Amino acid sequence: METTQKQIVLGILAHVDSGKTTLSEAMLYRSGMIPELGTVEKGNTMCDNDPLEKQVGHSVRLAVAHIDTAMPDLTPVRIHVLDTPGYSDYLGQDLSALDAVKSVAAVVDATQGVEMLTRRMMQAAKDRNLCRMIVVNKFEDPNADLVGLLKEMQEIWGPGVLPINLPTKNRTRVIDCFDRDEGDADIMSVEEVHRAFIEKIV
């Protein structure tokens, strides 16, 4: 019996230099779609392959990539990743991407906090009733105030903002707070965050 492939379209959005393209590249690499992890600095990422993008070091157009994977029940899934530019000059491309997706991931630079374009795009995603998630980038930076950042995000987007993952004490790895209820985290209590998720689900 032929199995129908599930299609997911995910928009990656954020203010410029927050790490959208780096996240997209990491997703492609970890899923086995590309053999080597490129970097924006080297100009060899899948999504920033335009000569101008390589020259200026950031996205200037909407890029599309895809990831082939499977659900836990082995149903095949193709995830279409839309990497948005992140500059106000290209806001039209960012907004048009929202019309093609069901979910968005907003990348927040832990050293900079929630920036203007990220707020604007998340509001636009909310207005379209899209599923929204937040990816905190550069959390390993010792100068990143993670407690302050979480408070800022909750003030902007509400108390429902909870970390699914918490950084370990040395900030080199993360602890999955959804499946686990114990661990030595750098901020907050894994047990308390896990309990908060369970209460929301129940």
Stretch-by-stretch model annotation:
Residues M1-S18, E36-L37, V56, P76, ...:
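P-loop NTPase catalytic nucleotide-binding module
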Residues M1-V108, W157:
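P-loop NTPase switch module centered on the Walker A-proximal segment
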